[in-house]
């Protein structure tokens, strides 16, 4: 929207007003984890460790590549998108273990 000029004629005719910028809707935040949730999940992962299928995924990634790991993850998780995210997470865990 263009800025009004305060003149009664022309393309931008009309009274000058400051436009209000509304706060973003709270529903836009859905799905984004809060700091507390991130902390609790990392704490649980640290204490409980990996589940058996996650250990198998790591083993498959290290040995036979990611395709088989993705297929196993899809079978366990139900959707290919979640499977890709899980395999990526396991890759990050492997990379972190190499660094330390």
Curated annotation (Swiss-Prot):
GO molecular function terms attached to this record: RNA binding; structural constituent of ribosome
GO cellular component: cytosol; cytosolic large ribosomal subunit
InterPro entries (UniProt xref): Ribosomal_eL36 (IPR000509), Ribosomal_eL36_sf (IPR038097)
Subcellular location as annotated: Cytoplasm
Protein's GO biological process: cytoplasmic translation
Keyword Ribonucleoprotein part of the UniProt annotation: yes
Keywords on record: Acetylation, Cytoplasm, Ribonucleoprotein, Ribosomal protein
Post-translational modification: N-terminally acetylated by acetyltransferase NatA.
Residues bearing PTM N-acetylthreonine: 2
Domain of life: Eukaryota
Record-annotated membrane-spanning stretches: none
Family: Belongs to the eukaryotic ribosomal protein eL36 family.
Quaternary context: Component of the large ribosomal subunit (LSU). Mature yeast ribosomes consist of a small (40S) and a large (60S) subunit. The 40S small subunit contains 1 molecule of ribosomal RNA (18S rRNA) and 33 different proteins (encoded by 57 genes). The large 60S subunit contains 3 rRNA molecules (25S, 5.8S and 5S rRNA) and 46 different proteins (encoded by 81 genes).
Note: Present with 31600 molecules/cell in log phase SD medium.
Function (record text): Component of the ribosome, a large ribonucleoprotein complex responsible for the synthesis of proteins in the cell. The small ribosomal subunit (SSU) binds messenger RNAs (mRNAs) and translates the encoded message by selecting cognate aminoacyl-transfer RNA (tRNA) molecules. The large subunit (LSU) contains the ribosomal catalytic site termed the peptidyl transferase center (PTC), which catalyzes the formation of peptide bonds, thereby polymerizing the amino acids delivered by tRNAs into a polypeptide chain.
Protein name: Large ribosomal subunit protein eL36A
Organism: Saccharomyces cerevisiae (strain ATCC 204508 / S288c) (Baker's yeast)
Gene behind this protein: RPL36A
